[in-house]
């Protein structure tokens, strides 16, 4: 039976005061969803309370207006339906329990107006407040990239608002990772020049090198992009930083190819990554991808898994980058002093699965077969709970991405990204009421 609520949620729902219509809506919906995630992942009761109280006091006030209809006033690219939040479930390994995280695009009453045409005011305000509350938060990378990645001629932006130029693209986001060691903050940046459109690699390089002037790992990334046939096809689209001292930088790219041959080339950086057990990891990863995309174990490495159905909503969550749904996504994880980057890749899985139930069953079957089945039933119950507004045996889209990283310890790190579908829930309830 799907877990619809938890004891921690019920207790807090009774004790925490009502604030206003908007915040009460987001707390009722996302607070309960987060509570179910934490319970399913086996978080101790104390950490469940701490995480939910953090969400209530810090995130809820910045989720913007409650949906008055099924259409978002400022549709966030974090989700297909425009919801300003996305959850992630980092799967357990043989020795470690799952981790829960969520990413949000902070919003306010001024989002999209002449006062805040790019919706960055709430992002900066929330970060400033958190820096005074959360230990070890470092806003230096945020200050730097906000000053170098975006247009700052406000007169141009305000004129664009007056002229009706569509500026509704998500340019910043903030992630909270609730770990055993404490809270980790990450910030995301997706710049776009008003006159010329998206950044090209040269623009990114100028900005990144200003903050990371000496990086062997970054040098390797650029060398790969210039010399590998696969690297030459990759398109940069945003970056993220850990907001701690000497934090990592994550540089995101899209590849148009969906073959495992392409995946192998990029994850090994053209053969530059070499270590014992790597080939076994790659073969296990291939098995996982074949299972997730519904292919047989002998599906050729140079074959592209068929798309179940063209995604007509692709534009809604890719910041005008519809090509981001046409291939696989990657990021290069640049750590200070590292000789090589780590690489994580993402499959926009809703394009390849028959239904959310089929995907969840395929994923949990692979986990169980690889000695990681401890939380499989909890995950299946979680998917049912988040999708109480629709049939997961017929619909798809709740599970948006599957991300994988070949860890140095021989494990494959797997993360599922889940959509709250708040606007979709409103749309469906309105249809039912008619």
UniProtKB/Swiss-Prot annotation:
Presence of keyword Transferase: yes
Record function comment: The PKS fogA releases the carboxylic acid (8E,10E,12E)-3,5,7-trihydroxytetradeca-8,10,12-trienoic acid as its product, as well as derivatives with one and two double bonds.
Keyword Cytoplasm carried by entry: no
Keywords attached to this entry: Transferase
Domain of life, source organism: Eukaryota
Family: Belongs to the tryptophan dimethylallyltransferase family.
Phenotype upon gene inactivation: Leads to the accumulation of the unprenylated derivatives violaceoid C and violaceoid A.
Positions with a binding annotation for substrate: 101, 248, 250, 252, 346
Cited InterPro entries: Aro_prenylTrfase, Aro_prenylTrfase_DMATS, DMATS-type_fun
GO molecular function, one term: prenyltransferase activity
The encoding gene: fogH
Protein name: Prenyltransferase fogH
GO BP term, example: alkaloid metabolic process
UniProt-listed CDD domains: PT-DMATS_CymD
Pathway(s) of this molecule: Secondary metabolite biosynthesis
Binding site for L-tryptophan: 86
Entry EC number(s): 2.5.1.-
NCBIfam families: arom_pren_DMATS
